[in-house]
A protein has these predicted regions:
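Alpha-helical membrane segments in multi-pass integral membrane proteins
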Residues: 149-156, 167-174, 182
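Glycine-rich phosphate-binding active-site loops on the catalytic face of alpha/beta enzymes
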Residues: 24-26, 46, 75-79, 99-113, ...
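Active-site-adjacent beta->alpha loops and helix N-cap segments on the catalytic face
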Residues: 30-34, 53-72, 83-89, 108-124, ...
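Hydrophobic faces of well-ordered beta-strands that scaffold small-molecule active sites
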Residues: 17-23, 52, 71-75, 104-106, ...
């Protein structure tokens, strides 16, 4: 299917007040294959997701052929010359758009980078797509919007060395964005429907939920850890009849 054919403002209107689901798999895990990612994307759309967030050109191509909802696209590249790894180069921007993304997610943290943020966001706009700056702090959000980002998200909160104390959704950062009057997308460690609703109460335009829905290994581990913890307390076990 081609990218969603709509004006940029209309595309955002379709996402406002809704949930996007991030369909990704860690390298080496059983679901790490374009066909599996596409099936995952179809499944979450059937469940009510208004859009999907997809990593990698091959996965983007497969998902674009499978769903007709907006796609947030990115490429993760670990490099030795920068800590920035979400769509770090202009070539990555080109690849993400060519593979069918409607919105391009770009690491917009203040860490040393290979390409100027303004040039990255301009490259997205020149191809009639929207850009999302993934940030970890209020100042980074401001800088991303000033550089031309169409959206900012809390994606990187808790994933930089200066914001690594996050254990749940970045509610504090969301409150800062709201007080500053900056529209934002909530993403990162949203594990429950109640946390999802709280993001909207704090002013999120839309939310992105990932591992709580699309990582069976992580979901299973949460259950297994609780079961193991209970099993370690034999005095709480019921006697079999």
């Amino acid at each position: 299917m081609p990218p969603v054919q709509t004006k940029q403002g209309d595309l955002l209107a379709t996402l406002d007040g809704t949930m996007v689901v991030s369909c990704q798999a860690e390298p080496g895990l059983p679901l790490d294959a374009p066909g599996h990612i596409a099936a995952m994307a179809r499944s979450v759309v059937l469940g009510g997701a208004s859009g999907v967030r997809i990593e990698g050109a091959a996965n983007l191509t497969a998902v674009r052929a499978a769903v007709d909802v907006p796609i947030i696209g990115l490429i993760k590249t670990k490099r030795g010359d920068t800590e920035v790894y979400i769509t770090p180069t202009l070539d990555d921007v080109t690849s993400v758009i060519a593979a069918g993304a409607d919105i391009v997610a770009i690491d917009a943290t203040g860490r040393p980078r290979l390409a100027e943020l303004k040039a990255m966001f301009s490259a997205v706009a020149a191809r009639a797509r929207l850009s999302m700056g993934d940030v970890a702090t209020l100042d980074e959000g401001r800088r991303a919007l000033d550089a031309g980002a169409d959206l900012i998200s809390t994606t990187m909160a808790g994933y930089t060395d200066y914001s690594s104390d996050q254990h749940g959704p970045a509610f504090g950062l969301m409150e800062e964005f709201a007080r500053a009057g900056l529209p934002f997308v909530a993403e990162g460690r949203i594990w429950t429907p109640q946390e999802a609703v709280r993001c909207f109460e704090l002013g999120a335009r839309f939310i992105v939920v990932g591992g709580a829905i699309t990582r069976p290994d992580a979901i299973t581990r949460r259950f297994a850890d609780e079961v193991a913890s209970w099993s370690a307390r034999p005095q709480l076990r019921r006697n079999p009849r």
